[in-house]
């Protein structure tokens, strides 16, 4: 490292510059005539002898450092100032289109962030689909949350934590457990749930020391979290470390522009601010702050003048506008079959689960590194996607459920932010016309759910919903969700590193135990719990061998599962082993087909059968008694005869290399030597190195001949078995039958056939008995 003197800095002038400036000022003073009048007292002037001494002092360090500068690789140009030049270029580009230069740091920071994260020209797209790396981001603080992006995510609803929250329900994990046949959660209305219970409940028992702690807290205030006898370890530690009464719930409201228009057109006229310069007017002469529909008009529409009925109708309308329509829009968006499929696919990337894990293994590409925001795809290799694998049982279920809850929150907030930004004045004027036209129909609706559905048709039309569904959800890593979780906890006054709280701990699990302002969060929590079980993320269904990437969900099983789809398994075994050439055309252009890992992975990720996808219920393939509705086929080569022929060609080529080939043959996939003897041939006896080469070759040929005979007597293993109990070298895929197709198999591929017979041959060499090996070695002695 370079040693910088304390008085020097990157922006301060150096000592030679100071001396040069002083010399220039002294030379300029010599040009002034002696009789010129002095206009200003310059104060003390340095005598010539003292000034020469000053220059001598400044010259000594330069002479001492002259030797160092000759050997310094940074001495040419202002290398250390290059980062300042780059950053100044970015700032200059940010303010180039502005008529005035910003004078405050806040304004400049806002312009700087918008230029970086929300540029006018979208980033260039690379060949792999991700946007190119932006070197301009190097100068933005790494762990800072940019305000230009967080347009909707920074808003919260500070609300009192109900005593009926999930953290105060010791049997919450048991109550949230779902089994086969469970349906997607729905929504409710205030008419259906007129009474709310926010208490602790009769089934919950306080811990032994909870009463003593409560007496101590009476002087400081009661916490909403109460220690219970059935609390798990995480909640017990959480309740002892923090005392909270309120929580910052992320805002999930409809766009403020829309809600302001709805309130102004359906409920109460918005009051305009008072102009001080205007003359005072009679408040009765204006409609500001008055109901949109008067009692006389409502009596005429309903055909009754009963004050109680009129009051109930106003309550119904208020509940529909403030609570139920938000739930209705949210339920329409998330309950769509296409949206549910896309959400579950993104969750498979987030947790590196099921078919995504299988694709990563075969393609040798970490697909879970892909993240996106508002349709722009990025590759981030710093994210983590296997953190959930370190947890077990209830801790894993709580973490997975909370991650999906945050994922749904982020998705909804992103959509609401886009909706809010796209609305213009002309759109709001058209919305006001539609609301005014449907005023009578809304006020005379059948019930609260009917009014909310009709209002949702107006403010959340199908065209808007489809547009948002096409761009959402985004790919997110567990690291992004963890940062989002920490951001929420910090806004709630909780230090994430000192407490083990999850945002879903403060949400009730039932609508009847949740205050209506938090019903949207209750719905998202219940939906997250459903998606966790529907995607088979709550438990680890994987195993060994073919079961390594197994997942029971409808996206993976049976069509994307190597265990259930034998055609897909056969196709995966011939990846990179053949090349098909088509006939030459008139332009001497030949079309070739090679089944590369990339081509197969792309087709594998796109493989989806909507007929066997049950979005609104948990209906796993293993729980069904009927076969799948769509046939089980491969991804690229969908004809079984072609796959069987490719397997036969592959086996014939491998047998030829093993029996008649000369030289050293390497497997193109693993690099293994195909026609050399097993390492046991060379290491079984210390005297084998003195055996003549011809006798060694004869022994190896005899070994291969015996192994080929043994291979015909070994069958495949049980489905999902690791293979440890059926011969040492059977491997993960099981064994085949000496290159010949078994009865009932597809083109010699067998349902549980191994990757190749030559791997079995190499493995069988290691499984020879000690007696036979010793006899062969003793015969080879000179």
Swiss-Prot record:
| GO molecular function terms listed in the Swiss-Prot or TrEMBL record | RNA binding
Xref: Pfam families: Adeno_100 (PF02438)
Which residue ranges does the record annotate as region Binding to host EIF4G? 262-329
Keyword set, alphabetical order: Chaperone, Eukaryotic host gene expression shutoff by virus, Eukaryotic host translation shutoff by virus, Host cytoplasm, Host gene expression shutoff by virus, Host-virus interaction, Inhibition of eukaryotic host translation factors by virus, Late protein, Methylation, Phosphoprotein, RNA-binding, Translational shunt, Transport
User: Which Gene Ontology cellular-component terms appear in the entry?
Assistant: host cell; host cell cytoplasm
Is this entry keyworded Membrane? no
Primary residence = host cell
Note down the stretches annotated as region Disordered. Answer: 715-760
Q: What conditions trigger expression of this protein?
A: Expressed in the late phase of the viral replicative cycle.
- Domain RRM as annotated: residue spans: 332-450
Write out the PTM section of this UniProt entry. Answer: Might be cleaved by the viral protease.
Q: Which residues carry this modification: Phosphotyrosine?
A: 349, 665
The UniProt entry's GO biological process terms, in alphabetical order, are: intracellular transport of viral protein in host cell; symbiont-mediated suppression of host gene expression; symbiont-mediated suppression of host translation initiation; viral translational shunt
Subcellular location(s): the record lists:
Host cytoplasm
Q: Where is the composition biased (Gly residues)?
A: 728-752
The record makes one more remark, namely: All late proteins expressed from the major late promoter are produced by alternative splicing and alternative polyadenylation of the same gene giving rise to non-overlapping ORFs. A leader sequence is present in the N-terminus of all these mRNAs and is recognized by the viral shutoff protein to provide expression although conventional translation via ribosome scanning from the cap has been shut off in the host cell.
- Indicate the quaternary assembly: Monomer. Interacts with hexon protein; this interaction allows chaperoning and trimerization of hexon proteins. Interacts (via N-terminus) with host initiation factor EIF4G (via C-terminus). Interacts (via RRM domain) with viral mRNAs that contain the tripartite leader; this interaction allows ribosome shunting and expression of viral late mRNAs.
Q: What family does the database annotate?
A: Belongs to the adenoviridae shutoff protein family.
This molecule's function is given as: Protein that inhibits host translation while promoting late viral translation by ribosome shunting. Blocks host cap-dependent translation by binding to eIF4G, displacing MKNK1 from cap initiation complexes and preventing EIF4E phosphorylation. Binds to the tripartite leader sequence of viral late mRNAs and recruits host eIF4G, PABPC1/poly-A binding protein and 40S ribosomes subunits on viral mRNAs, allowing ribosome shunting and efficient translation of late viral mRNAs even though conventional translation via ribosome scanning from the cap has been shut off in the host cell.
Q: What is this protein called?
A: Shutoff protein
Q: Which gene encodes it?
A: L4
């Amino acid at each position: 490292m370079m040693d910088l003197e304390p008085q020097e800095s990157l922006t301060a002038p150096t000592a030679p510059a100071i001396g040069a400036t002083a010399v220039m000022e002294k030379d300029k003073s010599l040009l002034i005539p002696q009789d010129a009048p002095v206009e200003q007292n310059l104060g003390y002037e340095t005598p010539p002898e003292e000034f020469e001494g000053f220059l001598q002092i400044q010259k000594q360090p330069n002479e001492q450092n002259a030797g160092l500068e000759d050997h310094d690789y940074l001495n040419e140009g202002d290398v250390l100032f290059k980062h300042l030049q780059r950053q100044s270029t970015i700032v200059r580009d940010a303010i180039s289109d502005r008529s005035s230069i910003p004078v405050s740091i806040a304004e400049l920071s806002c312009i700087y962030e918008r230029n970086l994260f929300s540029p006018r020209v979208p980033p260039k797209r690379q060949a792999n689909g991700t946007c190119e790396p932006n070197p301009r981001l190097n100068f933005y603080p790494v762990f800072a949350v940019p305000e230009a992006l967080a347009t909707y995510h920074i808003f919260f609803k500070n609300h009192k934590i109900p005593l009926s929250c999930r953290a105060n329900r010791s049997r919450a994990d048991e109550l949230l457990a779902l089994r086969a046949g469970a349906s997607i959660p729905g929504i409710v209305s205030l008419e259906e749930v007129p009474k709310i219970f926010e208490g602790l409940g009769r089934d919950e028992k306080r811990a032994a020391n909870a009463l003593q702690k409560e007496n101590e807290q009476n002087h400081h205030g009661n916490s909403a979290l109460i220690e219970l006898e059935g609390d798990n370890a995480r909640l017990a530690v959480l309740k002892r470390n923090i005392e909270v009464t309120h929580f910052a719930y992320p805002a999930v409201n409809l766009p403020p522009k829309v809600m302001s228009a709805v309130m102004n057109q359906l409920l109460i006229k918005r009051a305009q601010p008072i102009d001080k310069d205007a003359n005072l007017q009679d408040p009765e002469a204006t409609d500001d702050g008055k109901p949109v529909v008067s009692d006389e008009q409502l009596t005429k529409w309903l055909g009754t003048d009963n004050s109680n009925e009129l009051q109930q109708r106003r309550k119904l309308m208020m509940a529909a506008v403030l609570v139920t329509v938000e739930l209705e829009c949210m339920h329409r968006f998330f309950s769509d079959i296409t949206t549910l499929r896309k959400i579950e696919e993104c969750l498979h990337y987030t947790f590196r689960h099921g078919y995504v894990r299988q694709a990563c293994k075969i393609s040798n590409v970490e697909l879970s590194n892909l993240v996106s925001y508002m349709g722009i795809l990025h590759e981030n290799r710093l994210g983590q996607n296997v953190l959930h694998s370190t947890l077990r049982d209830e801790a894993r279920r709580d973490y997975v459920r909370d991650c999906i809850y945050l994922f749904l929150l982020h998705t909804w907030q992103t959509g609401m932010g886009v909706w809010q930004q796209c609305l213009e004045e002309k759109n709001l004027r058209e919305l006001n016309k539609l609301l005014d036209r449907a005023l009578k129909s809304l006020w005379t609706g059948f019930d609260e759910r009917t009014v909310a559905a009709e209002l949702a048709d107006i403010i959340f039309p199908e065209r808007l919903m489809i547009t948002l569904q096409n761009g959402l959800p985004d790919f997110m890593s567990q690291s992004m969700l963890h940062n989002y979780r920490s951001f929420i906890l910090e806004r709630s006054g909780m230090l994430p590193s000192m407490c083990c709280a999850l945002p879903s701990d403060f949400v009730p699990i039932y609508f009847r135990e949740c205050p209506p302002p938090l019903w949207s969060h209750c719905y998202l929590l219940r939906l997250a719990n459903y998606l966790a079980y529907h995607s088979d993320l709550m438990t680890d269904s994987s195993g060994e061998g073919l079961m390594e990437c197994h997942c029971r969900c409808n996206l993976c099983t049976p069509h994307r599962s190597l265990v259930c789809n034998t055609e897909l398994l056969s196709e995966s075994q011939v990846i990179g082993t053949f090349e098909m050439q088509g006939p030459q055309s008139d332009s001497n252009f030949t079309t070739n087909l090679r089944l590369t890992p990339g081509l197969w992975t792309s087709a594998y990720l796109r493989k989806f059968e909507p007929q066997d996808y049950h979005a609104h219920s948990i209906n796993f393939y293993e729980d069904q008694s009927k076969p799948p509705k769509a046939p089980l086929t491969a991804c690229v080569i969908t004809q079984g005869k072609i796959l069987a022929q490719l397997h036969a060609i592959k086996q014939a080529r491998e047998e030829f290399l093993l029996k008649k080939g000369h030289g050293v043959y390497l497997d193109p996939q693993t690099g293994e030597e195909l026609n050399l003897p097993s390492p046991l041939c060379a290491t079984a006896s210390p005297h084998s190195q003195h055996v003549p080469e011809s006798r060694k070759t004869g022994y190896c040929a005899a070994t291969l001949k015996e192994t080929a005979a043994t291979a015909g007597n070994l069958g495949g293993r049980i489905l999902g078995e690791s293979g440890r109990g059926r011969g040492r070298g059977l491997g993960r895929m099981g064994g085949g039958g000496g290159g010949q197709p078994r009865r009932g198999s597809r083109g010699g591929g067998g349902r549980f056939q191994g990757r190749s017979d030559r791997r079995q041959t190499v493995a069988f060499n290691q499984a020879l008995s000690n007696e036979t090996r010793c006899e062969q070695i003793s015969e080879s002695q000179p």
